[in-house]
Amino acid sequence: MSVVIRLARAGTKKRPVYHVVVADSRFPRDGRFIERLGYFNPLLPKDNEARLKLDMDKVKAWLAKGAQPSDRVMRFLDAAGVAKRAPRNNPEKAVPRKERKAAAEAAAKA
């Protein structure tokens, strides 16, 4: 059983509110869950304290048990200082192709 910490959508049409839940990864997004850890209201301003509420003790306990946070929940935990999110960069993307490299070298010489 693969356990994940993820967001389950609640609220009404055009007014989403998300519950942060622990669930089996095979369960539907808004379906059965094991435990509710908090909530996230994306409609509130980013500086509002009520935008995100998490029970950090429960979150740490589930992470210790091996629960995998979703990408969005990992961002929340990284901002809270609970877990460190690995950077997702592609260093090869910044390397110029041959034509651009030649043009860049010519521009540097001029």
UniProtKB/Swiss-Prot annotation:
The UniProt entry, under SUPFAM superfamilies, shows: Ribosomal protein S16
Where does the record place a coiled coil? none
UniProt KW Ribosomal protein keyword:
yes
Per its UniProt entry, which superkingdom is the organism in? Bacteria
> Per the record, GO CC terms?
cytoplasm; small ribosomal subunit
* Compositional bias segments (type: Basic and acidic residues): 90-103
Keyword Ribonucleoprotein assigned to the entry: answer is: yes
- Example of a GO biological process term: translation
| UniProt region (Disordered), positions on chain | 84-110
UniProt keyword terms in alphabetical order? Ribonucleoprotein, Ribosomal protein
The molecular function terms in GO held by this entry are: structural constituent of ribosome
Which InterPro entries does this one have?
A: Ribosomal_bS16, Ribosomal_bS16_dom_sf
Classification via Pfam families: Ribosomal_S16 (PF00886)
Q: Which family does it belong to?
A: Belongs to the bacterial ribosomal protein bS16 family.
Q: What is this protein called?
A: Small ribosomal subunit protein bS16
Origin organism of this chain? Afipia carboxidovorans (strain ATCC 49405 / DSM 1227 / KCTC 32145 / OM5)
